[in-house]
């Protein structure tokens, strides 16, 4: 009998399902791990206040738009912040056990929580008190008494600034441009954090084993803590960020013109050519060959 083989048929859907399924499974695992920390899709607001009336007032005012967590002093607030990794913290200053300034100082020097915006509340309005708050890393200051609308504006402004930074990460800007924005927008600890993450990825760029478990182990964080920090800083999950770094380097290799597509895919840790083309197209809008063609056409005009 005779067997006919179609030499030009790669059956991409059949051959490459494993790579896509693997990444999809990793993404689901990542999301499941962070859901163990937060049971809601709402951003988390941590209120640290020893006055029950003020605490209840803030919680009730923001419960429609935030998952509100509360703590009665700075020590409990710090513990809650490390557990929940909230999106923003509103804290009184004068509290028993640990005051708001000390809690702020402790959280801002811990890489797990250094990115979290903190608004300090105080009954004092002196310049010295405000200077002390900013010296320990507070992002904003609000004098009591205050209205819920004013607090809402402060919270929204801080979160919008963080979203703007995350949007810049998500955009298709050059890595060098991103680095400049990072340096200008983040505190020293968060700059070092992003630099370390990039270093860990780039050191093993050709490996397909870089995922949230590998990075969280190297950063000495739980998977959920790393996920929430990466999401807050970049707007991307950890594995999405890894893929974006791979694609940015793939673009650089492509523009150098020294390697063919298969070699580039291997150099950035993707051993499946079909999946590599798919990722590249998702990042830049075109598969690699079309991307080069478009660039050449643009340069000739």
Where are these regions (language model features)?
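C-terminal end segment of the histidine kinase catalytic
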Residues: 1-32, 163-169, 298-301
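Acidic, metal-coordinating helix/loop segments flanking the phosphotransfer/catalytic sites
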Residues: 70-88
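Receiver (REC) domain active-site loop signature in two-component systems and cognate sites
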Residues: 95
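C-terminal output helix
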Residues: 146-155, 159, 167
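Terminal helix-turn-helix DNA-binding modules in bacterial transcription factors
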Residues: 232-271, 294-301
